[in-house]
Swiss-Prot record:
Tissue-level expression: Expressed by the venom gland.
Secreted recorded as keyword: yes
Record-level Gene Ontology MF annotations: toxin activity
A GO CC term assigned to this protein in UniProt: extracellular region
Annotated keywords: Secreted, Toxin
Protein name, as recorded: Cupiennin-6f
Compartments, record wording: Secreted
Organism field: Cupiennius salei
Keyword Iron: no
Family per record: Belongs to the cationic peptide 04 (cupiennin) family. 06 subfamily.
């Protein structure tokens, strides 16, 4: 990945999407 921070945000967004 490019940046860990960006990856974290992406993961968080994906998790939120999956949860919803």
């Amino acid at each position: 990945f490019l940046n860990p921070f960006r990856w974290m945000i992406n993961k968080y967004r994906e998790w939120k999407n999956k949860k919803n």
